[in-house]
């Protein structure tokens, strides 16, 4: 079986969040760096740091929690398109998550971007995941 790096990112963040961990370490690839950059820009994580150990690159993510520490800041991360079932959308049919409050991450011909950027540029692509 092949590895799904995007599902791995989502699962690592979700598990660390449920376990109330402050940091999570994931393998660094071009795809993971682009997705983490979008998640950071949207404010779902606090900080990203590159780390090298035994000739392997990792990203160390600092998760964002509520100030009172009773709950997590991020609510839901969901993988949409996967290796067995690819989901594509043109720019007019990109779904709006939580009335525009959530984020859809797409893989387009111009790189990985959010739903807002794809609509602005008028391009569609593969829907990778939802964050809301």
UniProtKB/Swiss-Prot annotation:
Belongs to the universal ribosomal protein uS8 family. Keywords: Chloroplast, Plastid, Ribonucleoprotein, Ribosomal protein, RNA-binding, rRNA-binding. Gene3D superfamilies: 3.30.1370.30, 3.30.1490.10. The keyword Amino-acid biosynthesis does not apply. Part of the 30S ribosomal subunit. Transmembrane segments: none annotated. One of the primary rRNA binding proteins, it binds directly to 16S rRNA central domain where it helps coordinate assembly of the platform of the 30S subunit. This is Small ribosomal subunit protein uS8c. GO terms for molecular function: rRNA binding; structural constituent of ribosome. Its main location: plastid. It comes from Amborella trichopoda. GO terms for biological process: translation. The keyword Nucleotidyltransferase does not apply. HAMAP family: Ribosomal_uS8_B. It is found in: Plastid, Chloroplast. It comes from the Eukaryota. One of its GO terms (cellular component) is ribonucleoprotein complex. PROSITE patterns: RIBOSOMAL_S8.
């Amino acid at each position: 079986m092949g590895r799904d790096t995007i599902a791995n990112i989502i699962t690592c963040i979700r598990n660390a969040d449920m376990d109330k961990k402050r940091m999570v370490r994931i393998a660094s690839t071009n795809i993971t760096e682009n997705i983490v950059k979008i998640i950071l820009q949207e404010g779902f994580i606090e900080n990203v740091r590159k780390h090298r150990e035994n000739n392997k690159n990792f990203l160390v993510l600092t998760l964002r929690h509520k100030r009172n520490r009773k709950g997590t800041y991020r609510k839901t991360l969901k993988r949409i398109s996967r290796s067995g079932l690819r989901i594509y959308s043109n720019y007019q049919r990109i779904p709006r998550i939580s009335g525009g409050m959530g984020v859809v991450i797409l893989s387009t011909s111009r790189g990985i971007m959010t739903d807002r950027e794809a609509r602005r540029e008028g391009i569609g692509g593969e829907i990778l995941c939802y964050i809301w």
